[in-house]
C-alpha cells in the first residue's frame, strides 16, 4: 500500500511529491499520462518562471527540470504513459501498456491533473470550418515542440496569457499578428504580458470585440470581427475584415476534473475545480487537490507553493491517520470577489493561511478586506485589481491566535 499517490506529473504533482517526502513519507508514487514529467511547462519555452521560487528568471523547461531533478534525487518513483481511469478514497485504477489495468491501494491521493483549453465548439462562432483554426496551446505545441508554423497572418481571439504569449511567439517566428480580439472591456491576461507581448511588438488589442465570422472552406481566408455592446452582442455596422489565414483561440482554461466528478468530489461552479478546505482536502476524505485542477493560476510559482502544502497535508493524513472530525467554516465573499481558494477553513486553524481569489471586474483604488467573526482583521489597499490577476492575502498565525474558534470568515473588496 502506498502512503500518497499523486495523479499528474506537472509542476503541481512534482511539488506535491516533494512536500509529502518532506513530511517523512517514504512510499510515494507519481502517475503521469504523457511520456515525460513536467506537464505543460515542457512547451512553455519563454522566460518568466521561477522569480518567486528560485529568485531568478527561468524558461518553462528549466523550471520543470529543477523539480524533476529534486524528485529524482529523493528517489520518488513515477509511472509515465499511464492513464488513471478512476479514484476512490483509498484506491487508484490505472492503465498502461506494460501492466494493463491495475488497481493500487493508497492511504491518500493528491489530484494534480492541471487544466485544458476551452475548444472552438464551446464558442459557437459562425462561419466555415476550414483548416487554420487552433487553440493557442496547440499552436504553442506545434511551434515550440514540433517546429511547425500554424500560419502566416494571424488573428487571436481572447487575451488570456497563452494567447498573449503566442502573439509574441508567432511574431518572433515571422508571422504577422493582425490583432488580438477580446470580448470583455479588459484583458484577461497579466499586465506584464500585455506590455511584453503586445505593446513591445505593436500588436493591436481590440477590447469589447469578438469574431463574428470565419471565411474559408478549405483554409481560413479571412476573419470578420465586430464590436460588442454591454450585453456582449455584436453591433451591426461595426464589422472589421482581416485578411488572415489562421485563427488562434485563447478563450479560457477548464480544470481537468472528470476523475474528480467520478469520485463524487464536490466541484465549485465558479472555479470549475474541487471545493477544498485550508489543508487542500476535498469532501472525500483522504483526497487532496492542488494546482490548476483546483483553479487556474497566473504563475507556476504559486502552483508549486500551494501543491507543496497539499502534499504535506496528504502525508500527515497518511502517516498519522488524521481523520478526526473537524468543523469547517465556509469562507463567504463580498464586493467584487468571485470566490476564494480554499473555500473553507477549519475552526481551530492556528497557522498562516493563504487565501487566493479573483475579482469579477476591474477596480481602481480599492482595498481587500478580511473579517473574522464579524470583526475586520485585514484591510489592504490596492491601486488596481483586475480579473486577469489573482489576488493573494495571507492571514497570519498572530491574527488567528486571537480567536478560540472561527465562527465566520468573509473575504472581499471595498472602496
Predicted regions and their residues:
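Beta1-alpha1 glycine-rich phosphate/pyrophosphate-binding loop at the start
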Residues: 2-66, 70, 141, 150-194
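A Rossmann-like FAD-binding core segment of flavoenzymes
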Residues: 68-88, 92-94, 104, 171-258, ...
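Short amphipathic alpha-helical segments
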Residues: 17-19, 42-43, 122-125, 167-169, ...
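Predominantly flavin-linked oxidoreductase catalytic cores and closely associated redox partners
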Residues: 101-102, 111-205, 212-219, 286, ...
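FAD-binding core/adjacent interface of flavoenzyme oxidoreductases
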Residues: 1-7, 64-153, 229-237, 248, ...
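A conserved FAD-binding loop/helix module that cradles the flavin
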Residues: 290-334
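FAD-site-proximal beta/loop scaffold in flavoenzymes
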Residues: 133-143, 246-297
Amino acid at each position: 500500500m502506498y502512503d500518497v499517490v499523486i495523479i499528474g506529473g506537472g509542476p503541481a504533482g512534482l511539488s506535491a511529491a516533494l512536500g509529502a517526502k518532506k513530511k517523512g513519507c517514504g512510499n510515494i508514487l507519481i502517475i503521469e499520462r504523457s511520456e515525460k514529467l513536467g506537464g505543460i511547462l515542457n512547451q512553455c519555452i519563454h522566460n518568466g518562471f521561477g522569480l518567486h521560487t528560485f529568485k531568478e528568471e527561468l524558461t518553462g523547461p528549466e523550471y520543470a527540470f529543477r523539480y524533476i531533478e529534486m524528485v529524482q534525487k529523493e528517489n520518488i518513483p513515477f509511472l509515465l504513459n499511464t492513464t488513471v481511469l478512476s479514484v476512490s478514497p483509498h484506491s487508484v485504477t490505472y492503465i498502461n501498456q506494460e501492466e494493463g489495468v491495475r488497481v493500487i491501494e493508497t492511504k491518500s491521493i493528491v489530484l494534480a491533473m492541471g487544466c485544458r483549453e476551452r475548444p472552438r465548439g464551446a464558442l459557437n462562432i459562425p462561419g466555415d470550418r476550414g483548416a487554420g483554426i487552433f487553440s493557442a496551446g496547440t499552436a504553442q505545441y506545434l511551434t515550440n515542440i514540433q517546429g511547425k508554423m500554424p500560419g502566416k497572418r494571424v488573428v487571436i481571439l481572447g487575451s488570456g496569457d497563452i494567447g498573449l504569449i503566442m502573439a509574441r511567439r508567432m511574431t518572433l517566428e515571422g508571422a504577422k499578428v493582425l490583432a488580438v480580439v477580446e470580448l470583455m472591456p479588459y484583458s484577461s491576461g497579466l499586465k506584464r504580458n500585455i506590455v511584453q507581448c503586445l505593446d513591445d511588438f505593436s500588436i493591436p488589442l481590440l477590447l469589447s470585440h469578438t469574431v463574428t465570422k470565419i471565411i474559408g472552406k478549405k483554409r481560413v481566408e479571412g476573419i470578420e470581427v465586430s464590436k460588442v455592446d454591454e450585453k456582449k452582442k455584436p453591433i451591426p455596422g461595426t464589422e472589421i475584415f482581416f485578411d488572415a489565414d489562421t485563427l488562434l483561440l485563447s478563450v479560457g482554461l477548464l480544470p481537468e476534473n472528470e476523475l474528480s466528478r467520478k469520485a463524487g468530489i464536490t466541484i465549485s461552479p465558479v472555479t470549475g475545480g474541487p471545493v477544498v478546505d485550508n489543508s487542500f482536502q476535498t469532501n472525500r476524505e483522504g483526497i487532496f487537490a492542488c494546482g490548476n485542477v483546483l483553479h487556474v493560476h497566473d504563475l507556476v510559482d504559486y502552483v508549486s507553493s500551494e501543491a507543496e502544502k497539499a502534499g504535506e497535508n496528504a502525508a500527515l493524513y497518511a502517516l498519522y491517520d488524521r481523520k478526526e472530525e473537524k468543523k469547517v467554516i465556509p469562507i463567504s465573499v463580498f464586493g467584487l470577489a468571485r470566490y476564494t481558494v480554499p473555500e473553507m477553513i477549519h475552526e481551530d486553524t492556528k497557522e498562516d493561511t493563504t487565501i487566493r481569489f479573483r475579482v469579477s471586474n476591474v477596480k481602481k483604488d480599492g482595498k481587500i478586506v478580511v473579517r473574522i467573526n464579524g470583526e475586520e482583521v485585514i484591510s489592504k489597499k490596492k491601486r488596481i485589481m483586475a480579473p486577469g490577476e489573482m489576488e493573494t492575502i495571507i492571514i497570519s498565525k498572530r491574527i488567528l491566535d486571537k480567536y478560540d474558534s472561527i465562527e465566520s470568515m468573509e473575504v472581499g473588496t471595498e472602496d
